[in-house]
Amino acid sequence: MAEKLDFLKRWLATAIAFLFWAVAGTLLQLGLLPFAKKGKQANLSTQLKIRHFVGGIWYYFIRYLSCAGALKVTYHGFEKLGRPGQLVVVNHPSLLDVVLILSKAPSLNCIVKKDLLHNPTMRNQILACGFIPNTESLDLLDHCERVLQQESLLLFPEGTRTGWDGIVKLNRGAVSIGLR
């Protein structure tokens, strides 16, 4: 009986979290529209302020999941992140990876899957924060090189979440960016 209650509690907490994500994402979509329209013309200072704002919302989202018992997270070494020129390469086993990382280190820039620009709750967050859509081109490498002169960059070398089979397929983008 206790297991069923625990499952129900976590299921309800997760359902509320998805509702929060949808509502917060929609509100951010509207609120960040003017900044998203500026796109690449927005200055770094504005992008950093928006990243900290979005990271703060994600921080409280993670806090809710932790307090509700749906998630347990321990962070180590995050104080070392955020220096210009730093390429942060991490694996991507779950949907929440980027949220977990950027809630604790919101100044990081990030290469994101370009398909997320079609997601109605993520598009304006991505554009307003100045995140870099993965176009898998030489222009992307040049853009990353420019970004790394002033910022640190978060990169998922798998390109997407790890499959259910646990097999990791690395894309060569991390190596290409690192070598530049």
Feature-to-residue mapping (PLM):
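A transmembrane-helix-recognition feature enriched in membrane-embedded lipid enzymes
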Residues: 3-74, 124
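Soluble catalytic domains of membrane acyltransferases
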Residues: 67-180
